[in-house]
Amino acid sequence: MGDLSMAKSGRKINAANRIVAPGFIDVHTHDDRVLLAKPTMDMKISQGVTSVIVGNCGISLAPLVADNPPPPLDLIAEAGACRYSTFDQFLQEVEGAPAAVNAAFLVGHSTLRVGTMDSLDRAASLPEIKKMRSLLEEGLTAGAIGLSTGLFYKPAIMAPTEEVIEIASALKAHKARYVTHMRNESDHVIQSLDETFRIGSEARSPVIVSHHKVQGKNNFGRSVETLNHIDDHLHGHHHGIAFDVYPYVASSTVLKEDSIRLSERVLITWSKSRPDLAGRELSDIADELGCDIFSAAAQLQPAGAVYFAMAEEDVQRILSHPNAMIGSDGLPHDEHPHPRLWGTFPRVLGHYCRDLKLFSLEEAIRRMTGYSAETFGLIDRGVLKAGAFADITIFDEDTVLDRATFDKPMTPAAGIDTVMVNGSVVWEHGCATGNRPGHVLRHGGNHPN
């Protein structure tokens, strides 16, 4: 950038007739362990993603030492993966074995509960809350960018609002943020938004609603109500409100009875008791086993699933809101993952931007880059300007498109030509280069040379 008349380059990249954009930022991931297990991060760089935010939904690998962490931590942690007594220990390991992408880290509330409490089916005691707050403060001092909760899941579902407020009150001093998978995204979604706004207001912290949606046929169309509710509170919430969204009508998480009840279809993504059934419809499995879908689900546990429980009109309405960021919420350890893991960003660019003309190309890129970096405090990321980090994605606006499907969910996208992270090419000619130049994005640090 700037006057390059006297500059020499190590190589030249032909970007004629291509879009040269800041590298995309995936603001909602569960890539904590895969950064170390599969550091080339093909599922991200093939989409043009150069930075990820991990530790979402209350689930982080640290600070926790546990041989067999309980659900939902098993979404990211196999036996032995939770081996970090401090958050800084985890960050140092990632720094010592860089991935192809940059990563910023949230401290998970469920992780704090598992590491602190002797029984999880209750509210935390005052000494336990003090311990969790202290662990959060240690993580924030080490460089975490905020606290995440997954109040929809055990063990956090047992946490009253006051517990979360007390722990989250550590955020303000670090100018960190509160990120939440809310307690409910169906019939009680408005009450859950109110709880979220209260936590942010009393903790004096910005709030980010994870994967905003309305689920269940009875709630189709209620995104009008939820978005108006968010807009109404934006003006009175002095610390900021934002949300992320993925461009699909199906969600994915652990196999839960209440989620099954909301869904028109359920696709099994993994099962520890029956791994051979990953990728199958739950209804077909039930027919094969000679039982109803709930009995079949019980036989598959522990397991995960894709739930078809949203309306396309709601997805489009939420995507169109100016405060929406893009986050994949992909689960990289699933045997048969949701296609969002490989297709989220090209799907926004190709299907929703180019084909449906839901918003301009410039607006689509803003939601994936500069706005996301600003919201999460990622300094000199998400922009193309002199002196900023050289995270760059080059793509063909005419051909970019997701190719991952629910049948073949691990198919790389089309139209992503070249991806650079911190000035190093990590993806070109349809392949990962093997370069691993990613940085750990500690809160307030990582300025370019």
Q: Where on the chain are the PLM-derived regions?
A:
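Di-metal (Zn2+ and/or Mg2+/Mn2+) metal-binding site signature of metallo-dependent hydrolases
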Residues: 19-43
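Flexible loop/turn segments at secondary-structure boundaries
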Residues: 32-33, 59-63, 111-114, 154-158, ...
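Histidine/acidic residue-rich metal-binding segments in metalloenzymes
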Residues: 89, 123-149, 155-300, 306-325
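Short acidic, glycine/serine/threonine-rich loops at helix termini
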Residues: 62-68, 114-120, 161, 190-194, ...
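Histidine-rich, glycine-flanked metal-binding segment
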Residues: 1-23, 38
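Divalent-metal coordination cores built from histidine and acidic residues
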Residues: 37-145, 237-239
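Short, ordered loop/turn segments at secondary-structure junctions
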Residues: 3-4, 57-58, 152, 182-184, ...
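Active-site microenvironment of metallo-dependent hydrolases
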Residues: 45, 258-449
